[in-house]
């Protein structure tokens, strides 16, 4: 389900059209989404919200965005490849932890929650997840056996860099690009 509210379009045919509003997508199937892109397999459901969105000349200027696990009971699994790609969005910790430990023998892991937030202002995203920690934020909160928790460490990420990380994670079957 996708709902757009408070949408305002100004100067639509001008040199710098502006679009403002809120987009909400609910209960998206992660299995379908991750099969569409070369990201790694995930099972579950997510909600996506873009509030206070402002596009100028069809490019993002500001928004408050979040991707979070949907409420309800459903299978929650994440592949090692998806863990590595998610790690590339917020830091390299989980990918390195898998490669150094016995966790590398598992292909999939259970999770309790997934969440990533981005507050875009002045071309910089202030990043967050399902919970904050002293070192950063939790992107994937483990649950079940085997489980894994994925942390993000970069609180501020340039918009263009984040878009590049997402493109790299969704367009290749190789490891994440971490700078």
Predicted regions and their residues:
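Small-residue helix/turn framework positions
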Residues: 1-177
């Amino acid at each position: 389900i996708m709902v757009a509210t408070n949408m305002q379009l100004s100067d639509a045919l001008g040199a710098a059209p502006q679009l403002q509003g809120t987009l909400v997508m609910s209960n998206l199937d992660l299995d379908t989404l991750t099969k569409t892109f070369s990201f790694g397999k995930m099972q579950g459901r997510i909600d996506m919200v873009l509030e206070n969105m402002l596009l100028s000349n069809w490019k993002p200027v500001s928004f408050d965005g979040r991707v979070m696990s949907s409420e309800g009971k459903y299978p929650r699994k994440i592949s090692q490849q998806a863990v590595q790609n998610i790690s590339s969005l917020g830091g390299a910790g989980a990918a390195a932890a898998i490669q150094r430990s016995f966790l590398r023998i598992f292909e999939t892991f259970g999770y309790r929650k997934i969440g990533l937030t981005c507050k875009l202002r002045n071309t910089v995203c202030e990043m967050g997840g399902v919970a904050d920690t002293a070192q950063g934020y939790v992107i994937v909160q483990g649950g079940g056996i085997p489980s894994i928790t994925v942390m993000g460490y970069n609180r501020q990420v340039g918009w263009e860099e984040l878009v590049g990380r997402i493109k790299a994670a969704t367009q290749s079957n190789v490891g994440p690009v971490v700078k």
